[in-house]
Amino acid sequence: VKQGLYNNGGDGYVVARLATAVGIEVTLLAQESDKPLPEEAALAREAWLNAGGEIHASNIVWPESVDLIVDALLGTGLRQAPRESISQLIDHANSHPAPIAAVDIPSGLLAETGATPGAVINADHTITFIALKPGLLTGKARDVTGQLHFDSLGLDSWLAGQETKSQRFSAEQ
């Protein structure tokens, strides 16, 4: 599991903990930062460590016997090209022979537009939650998301009652 610093990184800790709980061997690589994690991500990190999980620096030598890379580096908040250190991790993952599953959105793909302003994960599968992000269906998404999987997490009826920011305009007015 390759994981980042924000809420998508929290998702990476959850995936790692759940995989370990069912007997899957996990190596978790995390970016170091002076900034504190958001509360939910920090709780997920703590749960991973309390379950006996280890966190490895992202610059370790990767094992060749990797069966799956889970991309939880960058999430839907990305607005620009990934920093150089993240770009190097993305390039390393893309060059590894193991398949890649992206959590929510491939790192480097902009959630609103589907643009790829820099390095981007070339996922074999992308698992997204709650709502389909426009960037998963437009721009370069077709080239980098692989097979797209969606789960509303049971929020369908709640989402149906929400107002959107979008408005329709009539040419007749």
Per-segment meaning from a language model:
Residues 66-173:
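YjeF_N-associated NAD(P)HX repair module
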